[in-house]
Curated annotation (Swiss-Prot):
Name by which UniProt lists this protein: R3H domain-containing protein 4
A cellular component annotation (GO) from this entry: nucleus
Domain of life: Eukaryota
Subcellular localization(s) per the UniProt record: Nucleus
Domain R3H span(s) in chain numbering: 187-250
Keywords, alphabetical: Nucleus
GO terms of molecular function: nucleic acid binding
Bias kind Basic and acidic residues: ranges: 151-161
């Protein structure tokens, strides 16, 4: 714990302490929050106050005495670099005419007593402890990114084993798989729909393909092709006819390496 010397204490208060000094916990020696100079300052000035305070604290560390002192100084400068990059427009105060902007992370931290306490606790630690904290935060950020997986736009279907021909066929509903295995499938019709979908979504992967189909078996084949290609298909009544709508759930269109018609021929 950081302690301050109390010059007003008498001899009776110095008992039990080396040198006759009385040490008080830091929180009890601080002025009240309501009368604090930092409280009366704007957010930008308050940010600069904490930065200057950190710089002054770092200047107290001898810069040419040992590896630990140098490491502590480098950690402090590294944190200040991160914090300064999060600030707003330079030279603008609260009263200046400027477009409203949401407060940065550092401004919010300066207004939060818990964050300030954590920052002070970090600054009071040794250089080795600070290094461990920074290393832990970096590792934690990388592990969270791995847990989130690929972001939107990162398509890994080519190397994903879930997109092998067998897994693509298993993606088709059980009822449709039974029909494809037991019935005599008109391969020409199946290949025609595969060719149409390939041509359409290869050019416009985010568009919606529509078709009017009154034949229920042909709609069934189209549903099967869409499920095999990982497309979304739905049918609805439109002016007494059945309309099919097909859309792509991904940003890009990557068809399986083996089409459904070829897969059925291999396993017939």
């Amino acid at each position: 714990m950081v302690a301050l010397e109390n010059p007003e204490c008498g001899p009776e208060a110095a008992e039990g302490t080396p040198g006759g000094r009385r040490l008080l916990p830091l929180p009890s020696c601080l002025p009240a929050l309501a009368s604090s100079q930092v409280k009366r300052l704007s957010a930008s000035r308050r940010k600069q106050h904490f930065i200057n305070q950190a710089v002054r604290n770092s200047d107290l560390v001898p810069k040419a005495k040992g590896r630990k002192s140098l490491q502590r100084l480098e950690n402090t400068q590294y944190l200040l670099t991160l914090l300064e990059t999060d600030g707003g427009l330079p030279g603008l105060e609260d009263g200046d005419l400027a477009p409203p902007a949401s407060p940065g992370i550092f401004a919010e931290a300066c207004n939060n007593a818990t964050y300030v306490e954590v920052w002070n606790d970090f600054m009071n630690r040794s250089g080795e402890e600070q290094e461990r904290v920074l290393r832990y935060l970096e590792d934690e950020g990388r592990s969270k990114a791995r847990r989130r997986g690929p972001g939107r736009g990162e398509d890994r279907r080519r190397e994903d084993p879930a997109y092998t021909p067998r897994e693509c066929f298993q993606r088709i509903s059980r009822r449709l798989r039974a029909v494809l295995k037991r019935s005599r499938i008109p391969m020409e019709t199946l290949e025609t729909w595969e060719e149409r979908l390939l041509r359409f979504f290869s050019v416009s992967p985010q568009a919606v393909y529509t078709a009017m189909l009154d034949n229920s078996f042909e709609r069934l084949l189209l549903h099967a092709v869409c499920q095999y290609m990982d497309l979304i298909s739905a049918s609805a009544d439109l002016e007494g006819k059945r309309q099919m709508k097909v859309s792509n759930r991904h940003l890009d269109f990557l068809p399986p390496g083996l089409l459904l018609s070829a897969y059925l021929e291999q396993h017939s």
